[in-house]
Structure formats: C-alpha cells, structure tokens
Amino acid sequence: MTTKTGILLVNLGTPAAPTTAAVKAFLSQFLHDQRVVDLPRYLWCPLLHFIILPTRSPKVAKLYQQVWTEQGSPLMVISKQQRAALEQELKREGVEVPVELAMTYGSPSLDEGWQALKAKGVNRVILLPLYPQYSVSTTASVFDGWAKAMKKERNLPVVRLIRDYHAHPEYIQALAMSVRRHWEQHGQGEHLLMSFHGIPERYEREGDPYGHQCRRTAALLAEVLGLEASQWTASFQSRFGKEEWLKPYTDVTIAGLPATGIKRLDVICPAFAADCLETLEEIQVQNREIFMAAGGEQFEYIPALNSDQAHIRMMVSLICRELA
C-alpha cells in the first residue's frame, strides 16, 4: 500500500463565540481534562459545575468580547492562516502533503482533523502541537485526544508526534527576529520580560519538563539578542486556583519593575504560537494597566510569531526532519 503523509497542526482551542454559553461549553471541556486539572473527580467536578463554570463563564465571555474580531476568535483566525501558509510553504519546497487544523478542545476536534486527512487518503500523520515547550497539560493532552480519535479505527495510521521545539535554532531565531523588528519600529525598552503560561509547581516536581524548557528558551533568546542578565526576566502567567504555580509570576514581576527604575518595558510570550486571550487581553490589557499604575511609562507587547514567514519556515524544518 502506498504511504501518503498528512500534517495535523494542533492548538488548544477557542470558544465558538464570545458568549457565556459558548465559553461555558469550552471551559467545561477544557477543565474536565485530567491532564489540565488532576484533582480527584469527586472533589473537582462538583466545584467545577456548581461554582467555577457559573461564575467564571460570564466573566471570561466579557474578556473574549474585547479581543473578538469580525472574522472570529483571534486564535482561530491565526491558526487558519498558519495552516494555509504551511501547506503553501511545503509545496514551494516540493513537499505535496495536505495540512489540516485541529484543536484539543472545541472545533475542529482532533477527530475532525483526522477525518479530513483520511478523506484525502492519508495513512501516515505528523502531529505538530503548536506548543514549543512540552507540558503534560498541553502536548500530552494532544496525544490523549489523538488516541481517543483512533478508538474506532480498524487500520491505525502511522503517527509521529513532534514533542517540542523549545531549543530549535530556527524557533529561537524567529523569536529574535520578531523582537529586533519590534525594536526597530518602536525603540528598545529598558527590560525584556519573557512571559510563559504557567503550570502548578507540583507538576514540575513530579517530572514535567515545561518549566526547565521555558527557562532554556528564555536564556537562548537572551543570548541571541545579546542581553545581559539584568536586561531580561522569564516569568509565568495565567495562574488559576490556590496551588503555587511556577514563579516568578508575571503580574507580580511587572508590578515591581517600575520601583527598580524600569519605566519602559517590552513583553514577549514565547510559549504562544498564536495570539489569543492570554496575550491580547491578559498581557496587552491587564498587565499593561498593572505596569502603568505602578509607575511605568511605556509598555510594549511584542506579538506572537503567528503566521510570520520565519515561524512557518521553522515548522517546515520540523516537518521535513520527520519526513526524512
């Protein structure tokens, strides 16, 4: 049988609409995942259904309304652009393979992504989760979702999972180019904050390499940019619940920087392959307000790599390595 390879780009997902009902459905699926919240179900499920979802859904819906575009969710719009750009760039390289998009939560699901590839005759799949740094709560959830999608298959396709690319030279260079381009257009701030999505500290103690990989990414980026240790900080955002998460916390760090004399701050979020609620609202709105209220004078958010040419070229490099 002839082997036909297909690519499945995977990201976390997004609500279908910026409404309370749509956000509630999305959060329910997301927060039911035991890779994300591993508390005992008998404790977590009542808390989730009777307290968290009813109170959090309308609040989060209002946040989504601030960043929603005419085309839809920023994450979905950008992800579709990435898919199309990747397929086109592969074609330019002489690699004629179909590329489909899937989300761990929401639509298109991993099963829907697989069915689209299967309809094109694909029997070998390269899974590319758009998480540069591996974590049990992200990359491992993609693996789980893929396994679930395979449950009804009689003839399983060959699958290759690109586990992470946190130190890939082309990824680091793409980030560096993005930072330099921003500095050329807006001037260089006095400090560069690299904010990564956080995870509970307990996950790291139990073996999750995410924190180490984030710190490695940050150090490599700082090295390429030629920054001294005093010119940059790696921090962690988006903590949820009462557990201790990886530190330093982004909001606490940002609040304290003006008192150290840093009035002009640049922020980049290297763990996000596409701009989304956590970058466009949490960083660009909430954390900007925190910085300015603490005495800051200039806050510059450096956008995610999104469908930047260097980002797409990096994806091609990752995929071609698996095709070899």
Curated annotation (Swiss-Prot):
- Catalytically driven reaction(s): heme b + 2 H(+) = protoporphyrin IX + Fe(2+)
Recorded family membership? Belongs to the ferrochelatase family.
Q: Where does Fe cation bind?
A: H197, E278
Q: List the residue ranges forming a coiled coil, or say none.
A: none
In terms of HAMAP family, this protein maps to: Ferrochelatase (MF_00323)
Q: Name one GO biological process term.
A: heme biosynthetic process
Query: What's the Enzyme Commission number for this chain?
Result: 4.98.1.1
| Subcellular locations according to the entry | Cytoplasm
GO cellular component terms attached to this protein's record = cytoplasm
The pathway where this protein functions is: Porphyrin-containing compound metabolism; protoheme biosynthesis; protoheme from protoporphyrin-IX: step 1/1
Q: Which molecular-function annotations from GO does this UniProt entry contain?
A: ferrochelatase activity; metal ion binding
> Under which name does UniProt file this protein?
Ferrochelatase
**Keywords per UniProt:** Cytoplasm, Heme biosynthesis, Iron, Lyase, Metal-binding, Porphyrin biosynthesis
The record's section on PANTHER family has: FERROCHELATASE, FERROCHELATASE, MITOCHONDRIAL
Q: What does this protein do?
A: Catalyzes the ferrous insertion into protoporphyrin IX.
